[in-house]
């Protein structure tokens, strides 16, 4: 087993803070990196060492050569990529491997295979994992041929960037006349965000549940899952609330999906922490969607129901430790819910709301956890993802977990900037959420009700906003008919 004495965290904000705390628990030195706008971010303040990687807000976090250079210069044994930025960049993992630095994640070739959704689909189908009916990459085909593919699959269809993720590079098409514009738009976005304009097509599963299984595998072929998470509460393909385990699915279905998730991970020779994502339709048919070859934003709810620290497990597996858990050891207890609190203005179509935080009082109490990087007087920069904090609740039942979530959100104070806290409270008040009736259309379907229940602390013209959004939603529905 390799000894890890110092870890560089190639990331920022909340996930960097999370990894630094795991390092402290293991008595491992932590190294933060930052760009100039992040100089006052919490991860920089609490790390044992911190190094600036540039003045540009984003570019430094994507500079493979510079990050590896700093890791070597400071004597880091390993690099943890977090999520986002370079976390699923196989060239970064390969650069670490070539430099003799432990990459805390899967091997570079696995990241490469699973990072291309088209390749991943083929691999899963070859190994008997159910996939959504669809095509290979479409870029070499004419538009007339693409229209024929769509007709054979049947509308609605969804166009996806092969190298995509995070809700980018996705277009849902309900009728043929919209296909060409959607295809060109999807290609442009894919090229901008992923430097790869490959696009493929799938049958669009209408209003599915988005269910993912947490995978953990060591370097010796031992792979298990740590139960599932329901990530169906989304807005524009971005997760808003996650729940573990999934309310309202049978034990038999849960077992079948879990076995399939492990088989999918074994098919690619997976190591470390990862996630197999499925779509579940109204008939309990499930389909492989993608694999995330990194730690997930929502990993804390799995930790809460299993008692397993995933970041510590990542580090130990990367150091060569044998996984001392079997599938029969994993027995979830209770329910956990995570709500992502973001700096967004609900009343202006969720535009980012950066600025200086005034009073800051995170929620407290039994079985309440907050993972965050913010503090009183911290200035939220405009350059990054708008997430401020993750509020994680644990309870013995789903009903009690929802009650606790509502209470904790009401106690959570972040002053002087707009946040989604009131909107999240509104979600907890809906009958469908409380009953566990969840699917990916939840927020869109209930948007008018949610806005009516959202407390407007800044006293904007709420009625006009709701009316405008209702009219927009009506137009969207009519365009699909």
Task: For the regions a language model picked out, list residue spans one by one.
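ATP-binding N-terminal substructure of ATP-dependent carboxylate-amine bond-forming enzymes
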Residues: 1-126, 139-148, 464, 469-480
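ATP-dependent carboxylate activation and anion-phosphoryl transfer catalytic cores
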Residues: 2-26, 30, 50-51, 72-74, ...
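Conserved A3 ("GATE") glycine/threonine-rich loop of ANL adenylate-forming enzymes
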Residues: 117-119, 164-168, 334
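Conserved beta3 strand of the protein kinase N-lobe
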Residues: 134-135
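Acidic/histidine-enriched active-site and ligand-binding environments that engage anionic O-linkages
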Residues: 148-158
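N-terminal nucleotide-binding beta1-loop-alpha1 segment
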Residues: 161
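Glycine/aspartate-rich loop-and-adjacent alpha/beta segment that forms the canonical ThDP
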Residues: 171
């Amino acid at each position: 087993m390799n000894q890890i004495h110092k870890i560089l965290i190639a990331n920022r904000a909340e996930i960097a803070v999370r990894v630094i705390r795991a390092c402290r628990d293991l008595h491992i030195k932590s190294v933060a990196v930052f760009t100039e706008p992040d100089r006052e971010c919490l991860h920089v303040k609490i790390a044992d060492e911190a190094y600036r990687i540039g003045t540009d807000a984003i570019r430094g976090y994507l500079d493979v050569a510079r990050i590896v250079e700093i890791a070597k210069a400071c004597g880091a044994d390993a690099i943890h990529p977090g999520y986002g930025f370079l976390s699923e960049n196989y060239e970064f993992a390969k650069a670490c491997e070539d430099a003799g630095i432990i990459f805390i994640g899967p091997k570079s070739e696995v990241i490469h295979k699973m990072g291309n959704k088209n390749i991943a689909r083929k691999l899963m189908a070859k190994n008997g994992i159910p996939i959504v009916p669809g095509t290979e990459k479409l870029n070499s085909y004419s538009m007339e041929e693409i229209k024929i593919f769509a007709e054979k699959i049947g509308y609605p269809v969804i166009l996806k960037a092969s190298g995509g993720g995070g809700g980018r590079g996705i277009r849902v098409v309900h009728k043929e006349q919209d296909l060409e514009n959607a295809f060109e738009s999807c290609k442009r976005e894919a090229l901008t965000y992923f430097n790869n304009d490959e696009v493929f097509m799938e049958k669009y599963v209408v209003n599915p549940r988005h269910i993912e299984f947490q995978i953990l595998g060591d370097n010796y072929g031992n792979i298990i899952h740590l139960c599932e998470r329901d990530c169906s509460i989304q807005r524009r393909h971005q997760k808003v609330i996650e729940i573990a385990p999934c309310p309202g699915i049978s034990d038999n279905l849960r077992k079948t999906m879990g076995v399939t998730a492990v088989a999918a991970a074994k098919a690619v020779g997976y190591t470390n922490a990862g996630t197999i994502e499925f779509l579940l339709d109204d008939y309990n048919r499930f389909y492989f969607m993608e694999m995330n070859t990194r730690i997930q934003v929502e990993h804390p709810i799995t930790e809460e129901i299993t008692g397993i620290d995933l970041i510590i497990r990542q580090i130990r597996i990367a150091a060569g430790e044998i996984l001392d858990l079997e599938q029969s050891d994993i027995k979830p207890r209770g329910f956990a819910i995570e709500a992502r609190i973001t700096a967004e203005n609900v009343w202006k179509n969720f535009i980012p709301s950066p600025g200086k935080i005034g009073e800051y009082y995170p929620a407290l109490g039994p079985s309440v956890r907050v993972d965050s990087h913010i503090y009183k007087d911290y200035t939220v920069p405009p350059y990054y993802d708008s997430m401020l904090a993750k509020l994680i609740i644990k309870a013995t039942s789903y009903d009690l977990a929802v009650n606790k979530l509502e209470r904790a959100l009401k106690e959570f104070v972040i002053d002087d900037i707009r946040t989604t806290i009131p909107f999240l409270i509104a979600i907890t008040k809906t009958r469908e959420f409380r009953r566990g009736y969840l699917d990916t259309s939840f927020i869109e379907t209930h948007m008018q009700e949610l806005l009516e229940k959202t407390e407007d602390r800044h006293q904007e013209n709420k009625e006009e906003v709701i009316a405008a959004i209702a009219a927009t939603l009506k137009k969207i529905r009519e365009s699909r008919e």
